[in-house]
Swiss-Prot record:
Coiled-coil annotated spans: none
GO biological process, one term: lipid A biosynthetic process
Organism: Sphingopyxis alaskensis (strain DSM 13593 / LMG 18877 / RB2256)
Residues bound to Mg(2+): 104, 228
EC number of the protein: 2.7.7.23, 2.3.1.157
Region (N-acetyltransferase), start-end ranges: 252-451
Keywords: Acyltransferase, Cell shape, Cell wall biogenesis/degradation, Cytoplasm, Magnesium, Metal-binding, Multifunctional enzyme, Nucleotidyltransferase, Peptidoglycan synthesis, Repeat, Transferase
UniProt lineage: Bacteria, Pseudomonadati, Pseudomonadota, Alphaproteobacteria, Sphingomonadales
Principal subcellular localisation of the protein: cytoplasm
Name assigned to this protein: Bifunctional protein GlmU
Cofactor(s) this protein cannot do without: Mg(2+)
Length: 451
């Protein structure tokens, strides 16, 4: 039977290289805090316990986690071994397997965590499992010296011999151990080093000295990249986006210029979706089969139906719902608006706090005037209604089914089904007036030039 699982996530560092008032592990990747990327992978294992070790800006972490994990405070911060020990009280009475993870290493797949736990549960019963990798440039990393998959020694780069530096297998910092072994070993770690800190890696050396097996599991370097600076954050974003683009195309979406499309962590695409260059998706976007998103569109919090066309240069904001084959064209902004099947707003329009019936046509320059300075109000446009260009619909207002609003109208009262509403000033015709005006102005200008 599988042992229960606990995850200890270290997130107590100050993150000074980020130069930010926001906690390092809360900086977003694809619109989601990096810590929550990691926690989502942890959740795939159905852990019995999750403990996040916090220090600086603990209140921010508490808010972000929203009660989904227990918090343990590390104060003062005396190294990684000391940090893990702060989780001991939260795991009191827990007799299972423990994963030790880092909040600034967000891309560890659940499958890699499972591989570590499987190795921990093997018949040779290792005391500690170390996750290691082979980076392109191992210069900065501690080395993992092995005999087969047995860890013989772990050594920091600065302390390594030339022969040890030639080894390319490096320590990711991630480990797994049984709870009873982990805390017993940590109790024996000392701060007998120049930094006067308690190092987590020392549990491997202690276990080896006891004659216990310490095993290694290898992973791809991309899975264990740490984020300590804005440059590394940007690199992590690029890594995530590249993976997601490949995933989207493999699932049946067409990306005309993949490197220019930016997804959110939760973007959902149907089959045969086409995305043109320079499109940005914020959180909460669902796109059904066969929709087309044209260039330079920005979409967040929107549900887009099958066969819809959006853009170019469109902005869909939270609360937008487009029915099947609806069209939103260039320089159209939509917020908290529901458009029925086949409804169209092809250019230069704002639709906010509105419902638009199936087959309705919204002319260029139409504005739903939804805000009175204090409250938002609803505009309701019926099925097959036609709103002429340059119209202002002052909410709250209802436009009936099959109604027509003439171009240039400012509508403040409801329009019934099938009605024509024209709201314009009187059109005056003054024959010859323009000729007389130009003649007078030319004479005046000539007189001024003679002075």
């Amino acid at each position: 039977m599988n042992n229960p699982i606990a995850a200890i996530v270290l997130a107590a560092g100050k993150g000074t290289r980020m130069k930010s008032d926001l906690h390092k592990v809360l900086h977003p990747i694809a619109g989601r805090p990096m810590l929550l990327h990691l926690m989502a992978s942890v959740d795939e294992l159905s852990p019995a316990k999750k403990v996040v070790v916090v220090g600086d800006k603990a209140d921010q972490l508490e808010a972000a986690l929203s009660g989904t994990a227990e918090l343990a405070v590390q104060e003062p911060q005396l190294g990684t071994g000391h940090a893990v020990r702060q989780a001991e009280a939260a795991l009191s009475g827990f007799d299972g397997d423990v994963l030790i993870l880092y909040g600034d290493v967000p891309f560890v797949p659940a499958a890699t965590m499972r591989a570590m736990l499987d190795r921990l549960g093997a018949s040779d019963a290792p005391a500690v499992v170390v996750l290691a990798f082979e980076p392109a440039d191992p210069l900065q990393y501690g080395r993992v010296i092995t005999d087969g998959d047995r860890v013989v020694k772990m050594v920091e780069h600065k302390d390594a011999t030339d022969a040890e530096r030639a080894v390319r297998l490096c320590n990711s910092g991630l480990m797994a151990a049984r709870a009873r072994d982990l805390f017993a070993l940590l109790a024996r770690v000392t701060d007998d080093n120049a930094a006067k800190e308690f190092y987590l890696v020392d549990i491997v050396n202690i276990a080896n000295a006891d004659g216990r097996l310490c095993a290694v599991v290898k992973t791809d370097p991309a899975d264990v990249g740490g984020i300590n600076s804005r440059a590394e954050l940007a690199a992590a974003e690029a890594q995530w986006q590249a993976f997601r683009r490949e995933e989207a195309m493999a699932a049946g979406a067409s990306l005309r210029a993949p490197e220019t499309v930016w997804f959110s962590w939760d973007t959902q695409l149907g089959r045969d979706v086409t995305i043109e260059p320079n499109v940005v998706f914020g959180p909460g976007v669902k796109i059904a089969d066969g929709a087309t998103i044209r260039a330079f569109s920005h979409i967040e919090g929107a549900t887009i139906g099958a066969g819809c066309e959006v853009g170019p240069f469109a902005r869909l904001r939270p609360g937008t719902v487009l029915g099947e084959k609806a069209k939103i064209g260039n320089f159209v902004e939509v917020k908290k608006a529901v458009l029925g099947a086949g409804a169209k707003a092809n250019h230069l329009t704002y639709l906010g706090d509105a419902t638009v019936g199936a087959g309705a046509n919204i002319g260029a320059g139409t504005i739903t005037c939804n805000y009175d300075g204090y409250f938002k109000h609803q505009t309701q446009i019926g099925e097959r209604a036609f709103i002429g260009s340059n119209s202002a619909l002052v909410a709250p207002v209802k436009i009936g089914a099959d109604a027509i609003v003439a171009a240039g109208s400012t509508v403040t009262l409801d329009v019934g089904d099938g009605e024509l509403r024209i709201v314009r000033g009187e059109q005056l015709v003054k024959p010859g007036w323009a000729d007389r005006f130009h003649d007078a102005m030319r004479k005046k200008k000539a007189a001024e030039q003679k002075k």
